[in-house]
Amino acid sequence: MKNLLDLSYEELITEITNLGLERYRADQILDWIFNKKVNNFDEMTNLSKKHRALLKEHFSIPFLKLLDKKVSRIDGTTKFLWELEDGNTIESVMLFHPDRITACISTQVGCPVKCIFCATGMSGFVRNLTTGEIVAQILSMEKEEKKKIGNVVYMGMGEPLLNYENTIKSIRTLNHKKMGNIGIRRITISTVGIPDRIIQLAEEGLDVKLALSLHAPTNFKRDQLVPLNKKYSIEEILNAVKIYQKKTGNRVTIEYVLIKGMNDEISDAKKLAEILKNMKVFVNLIPVNPTVEDLKKPSRERLLTFKRILLESGIEAEIRREKGADIEAACGQLRLKRIKSTS
């Protein structure tokens, strides 16, 4: 039995016409799923009983099982812990802004990258998510909260570009006007930097936003924070980003988690400005989340100094406003606690 959420629009049409249904039935089915959040064929009342029975024989529409939910009393940020059909767990987050709702979604169960400041990597890597499991996070959150998501960031558990095919296919699904209907410029892929995949992304014809999790201005420091840097150097990654920018013309967000005593020195800020010189970038400065006890946030004064040095060097930068601090909204924390409690 096929997961219908794994299928592209064109694949769904092919599948149902092969079963003898008319093409337009695909639009009816997708309207039930994406607009009405119905994942039971029996409830699709504009389909005949015969068609419903036939579809049930061949397809499933698995939304995700909610295991836990935390809501921030500060800003309403909502964090979800989901169970997949095989019993694995993943996290998603809904972030509320005055003019939009953003979803932060996962692409892997666990993560192989193991950045030292991220809770997800602490539990190891299990597997890639399917296209359907990525898409189901959006549908399940919308169904649970009865709200429409307008922006999507692939910044949850896992490295999206190490699950490239399913990530790209899920973006096409979420963007398709008959499916997720989310504007392509409202979708962001966040990556630690897989050079060949960044270049491949530039050729996809998808005008998504790209965010690079850099976190250090030198290979020596980045090797300590992001172990994958030993495979892909900063120079290789930034060269790939330059190729991406030449092809797309898009500005790239540089994510930089600031950790006291590790990457927050004045020399780090100056070096960061140097390596980003003449690039079309915006730097998002992120005070570290306390996922690991010995990692501390820099002082407010140091954050402002770091930002000022970048601005004076002609690099756009901002300190990201923390959301969901009271519910540990950083990805991986809720799942890690559950794993520890059940082991």
From Swiss-Prot:
GO cellular component terms given for this protein: cytoplasm
Single Gene Ontology BP annotation: rRNA base methylation
Location(s), subcellular: Cytoplasm
SUPFAM superfamilies assigned: Radical SAM enzymes
Database matches in InterPro entries: Aldolase_TIM (IPR013785), Elp3/MiaA/NifB-like_rSAM (IPR006638), Methyltransferase_A (IPR040072), RlmN_N (IPR048641), RNA_MTrfase_RlmN (IPR027492), rRNA_lsu_MTrfase_RlmN/Cfr (IPR004383), rSAM (IPR007197)
Entry binding sites for S-adenosyl-L-methionine: G158, E159, S190, S213, L214, H215, N289
Signal sequence bounds: none
Residues at the active site: E91 (proton acceptor), C331 (s-methylcysteine intermediate)
Gene3D superfamilies linked to this entry: 1.10.150.530, Aldolase class I
Function: Specifically methylates position 2 of adenine 2503 in 23S rRNA and position 2 of adenine 37 in tRNAs.
Stated name of the protein: Probable dual-specificity RNA methyltransferase RlmN
Enzyme class: transferase
Other known facts: Reaction proceeds by a ping-pong mechanism involving intermediate methylation of a conserved cysteine residue.
Similarity annotation: Belongs to the radical SAM superfamily. RlmN family.
EC number(s) reported in the record: 2.1.1.192
Keyword entries, A-Z: 4Fe-4S, Cytoplasm, Disulfide bond, Iron, Iron-sulfur, Metal-binding, Methyltransferase, rRNA processing, S-adenosyl-L-methionine, Transferase, tRNA processing
Domain Radical SAM core, residue spans: 97-326
Cofactor: [4Fe-4S] cluster
Domain of life of the source: Bacteria
Chain residues that bind [4Fe-4S] cluster: C111, C115, C118
UniProt GO molecular function: 4 iron, 4 sulfur cluster binding; metal ion binding; rRNA (adenine(2503)-C2-)-methyltransferase activity; rRNA binding; tRNA (adenine(37)-C2)-methyltransferase activity; tRNA binding
Pfam families named in the record: Radical_SAM (PF04055), RlmN_N (PF21016)
Free-text comment on the cofactor: Binds 1 [4Fe-4S] cluster. The cluster is coordinated with 3 cysteines and an exchangeable S-adenosyl-L-methionine.
NCBIfam families: rRNA_mod_RlmN
Disulphide-bridged cysteine pairs: C104-C331
Species the sequence originates in: Thermotoga petrophila (strain ATCC BAA-488 / DSM 13995 / JCM 10881 / RKU-1)
Catalytic activity annotation: adenosine(2503) in 23S rRNA + 2 reduced [2Fe-2S]-[ferredoxin] + 2 S-adenosyl-L-methionine = 2-methyladenosine(2503) in 23S rRNA + 5'-deoxyadenosine + L-methionine + 2 oxidized [2Fe-2S]-[ferredoxin] + S-adenosyl-L-homocysteine; adenosine(37) in tRNA + 2 reduced [2Fe-2S]-[ferredoxin] + 2 S-adenosyl-L-methionine = 2-methyladenosine(37) in tRNA + 5'-deoxyadenosine + L-methionine + 2 oxidized [2Fe-2S]-[ferredoxin] + S-adenosyl-L-homocysteine
